[in-house]
């Protein structure tokens, strides 16, 4: 019994140390995997808001990589930064035909004449689809 009383405080200290060490891991980013084209704007904005790096754009014929290009979304506004030069703009959210047979909330992040719409967020990756004839799909990674 006396040995148990000597070991018990050590076990208690070990459990406390282990418990506090694991608390820091609870703050990991939630793994998101959702489509956005079928959501309402408050949900879309909540998932899209923040800093993103534009990595690539592609369609059936072409693939384009981007360097030093970043987009910060903040509800109805964005800031496009390329090679250190920042250009702010308005997203002008509106529900309209995508040209792919369904409606989605379009935004003017690339070109006003060819708006884009958010397709999905998977983990730290955002996919945007433009409504142009070329039909580019853009990949952005959260910073």
Listing of model-derived features with the role each one plays in the protein:
Residues 23-26:
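Bacterial signal peptide processing site
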Residues 1-9:
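Bacterial N-terminal signal peptides that target proteins for export
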Residues 18-21:
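C-terminal motif of bacterial Sec signal peptides marking the signal peptidase cleavage site
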Residues 141-143:
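Short, solvent-exposed mixed-charge patches
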Residues 58-65, 75-125, 129-137:
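Contiguous, well-ordered beta-strand patches that form the walls/edges
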Residues 33-53:
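N-terminal helix-cap/turn-to-beta initiation motif at the start of protein domains
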């Amino acid at each position: 019994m006396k040995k148990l009383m000597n070991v018990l405080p050590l076990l208690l200290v070990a459990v406390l140390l282990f418990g506090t060490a694991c608390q820091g891991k609870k703050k990991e980013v939630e793994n998101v995997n959702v489509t956005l084209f079928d959501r309402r704007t408050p949900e879309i904005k909540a998932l899209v808001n923040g800093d993103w790096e534009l990595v690539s754009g592609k369609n059936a014929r072409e693939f384009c990589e981007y360097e030093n290009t970043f987009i910060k979304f903040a509800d109805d506004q964005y800031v496009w930064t390329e090679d250190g030069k920042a250009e702010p703009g308005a997203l002008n959210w509106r529900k309209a035909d995508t040209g792919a047979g369904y409606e989605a909330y379009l935004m003017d992040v690339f070109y006003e004449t060819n708006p884009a719409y958010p397709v999905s967020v998977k983990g730290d990756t955002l996919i945007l689809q433009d409504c142009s004839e070329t039909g580019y799909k853009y990949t952005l990674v959260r910073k």
